[in-house]
Amino acid sequence: LFGHKGLPLYAVSGLDMAYWDALAQAAGLPLARFLGGPMDPIPAYNSNGLGLTDDLGALADEARSLIAMGDFKAAKVRLGRDTLDADIAAFRAVRDAVGPDVKLPVDFNQGLDLEEALKRGAALDAEDCYWIEEAIVYDNMTGYAKMKAELKTPIQIGENFHGARDMSDALAADACTWVMPDLQRIGGVTGWRCAATIAEEAGAPMSSHIYPEVSAHVMAGTPTAHWLEYSDWAAPVMAEPLKIENGHAVIPDRPGTGVAWDEDAVKRYALEL
């Protein structure tokens, strides 16, 4: 039903991550070191919040709070409101709140058609926007190539690459400036390593998409590593959540991925079906 781009690949990715975690644990090494990478902290941006609210005061307050969480140097802004003016007003509210030195990528979550994406992208070109992410449907490579050719702001795609070949095809089509694969969809650690080689050959900066607890390890060994997307979704059920210091993710010096569940929290949040 889902084909090779659906549930089967998600399952393979999960098993692959577990496999690499087990190997690193057996070796007594953090996964990053087991993969041959350094343990240096990874530049991270805060991807919690900054959604499509029309309350610009609340949006500004949230932006200041997100930057202060870990002295972040970047935070993602969600756009895709009913009008261009509303999106620009929201972006400016965040920019005014955090100042000129904080990088502000934006994500449209595939919410626009190509004509509107070009229109809003042109407006964002004048707003010191760090990147434009997934403005149109994820597999419209012709459209993304047109955006990259006509806009000044870097074009970021990749969370919907299903396997490393998708990344190769996107880069061959000149459909993006930067790439950001998702561990669940790219093929786990093995798929990530393949994608990292492709990105290196293309000279394409490569960021991660969510799963920061594992992504930090694979980013450490990525030659063109760019930004780790940080979200704290799993923190409430983790014994030791991923640490952020001075805007960087600190790779845990524990065997494997270092992920350990807070069993009491897991039971507290569990749903009985």
Show which residues each predicted segment covers.
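N-terminal capping/lid subdomain adjacent to the active-site entrance of alpha/beta enzymes
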Residues: 1-104, 109-111, 115-118, 122-126, ...
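Residues at the C-termini of beta-strands that transition into short coil/loop
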Residues: 48, 159, 210, 231, ...
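Catalytic core of soluble alpha/beta enzymes
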Residues: 77-209, 217
